Amino acid sequence: MPLVDPVTMSTPSTPAKAMGKSLPNTVKDPSPPPKAGSHTRSPVESPSNSYYIAASIPALQLQIFVLLWKRLVDDPVATMSRLILPVMALIQVFYAVVLLPVAGSGKQWRKPRPGEKKKAQGGEPNIALATLLSLLLTLIATPPIHALMVLFGAPFLTHAPHTFLCALNLSLLTLFPLFYTRGAEASAWRALAGFTAPIDESVGGLVGACFGAWLGAVPIPLDWDRDWQRWPVTVLTGIYVGYAIGSYGGRTLLRIRGYSAKRS
């Protein structure tokens, strides 16, 4: 029997080991894995895209109103109830849900003190519920706005549907975004009523629409005998024009304040 040197004898190598030595090391991805429940940001949610989309909303609403202005002069009630209000409601809901922060989304939760039991913290606000609640509050706020218009000289008995629909337009444009972003927080509404709230597009739109409604009532008593002088064509026109101007003015002030904060 031949002798075999144990030193020179080669051990059989498996194919897996041979392939493992020949293959280069795999480079691992340094980026952390996505968290559970996270989603890819859509193009609309991009900060640059969302700014331009939000900036185009008042201009779009004003263009739609201009296209429907002739019909508004001919039949104010039918045009407001069947065309203007449904279209504006859809635009406002899209604007709020996609581009505005819902009330409570940026709330900072307080850490429990030593010995204090940790309270159950709710998750993110329910956007669908917040939208429905904001629409309901918008509808509830319409009768008080109607009453204010009557106090400022709107017809009391003869044009009640006209006044109510005009008040609903004003409430939908100005109060719905505020209800959606501020919710029922008393401090936020006190700051808004006391003119101490920071100026943004929603506050600017509110101020501009109210001033536009007041300015739009000026041509009504003039003796020009024009169809567009009928209630509430000029007032509603002033609301939409003032809302667009105020919204862009508030947006500009907000950007200037943010730019100044970055520089400081």
Curated annotation (Swiss-Prot):
Keywords: Endoplasmic reticulum, GPI-anchor biosynthesis, Membrane, Transmembrane, Transmembrane helix
Pathway: Glycolipid biosynthesis; glycosylphosphatidylinositol-anchor biosynthesis
InterPro entries per the UniProt record, alphabetical: GPI_biosynthesis_protein_Pig-F (IPR009580)
Compartment(s) where it occurs, according to its Swiss-Prot or TrEMBL record: Endoplasmic reticulum membrane
Family of the protein in this entry: Belongs to the PIGF family.
Role noted for this protein: Acts in the GPI biosynthetic pathway between GlcNAc-PI synthesis and GPI transfer to protein.
Name under which the protein is recorded: Glycosylphosphatidylinositol anchor biosynthesis protein 11
Organism of this sequence: Pyricularia oryzae (strain 70-15 / ATCC MYA-4617 / FGSC 8958)
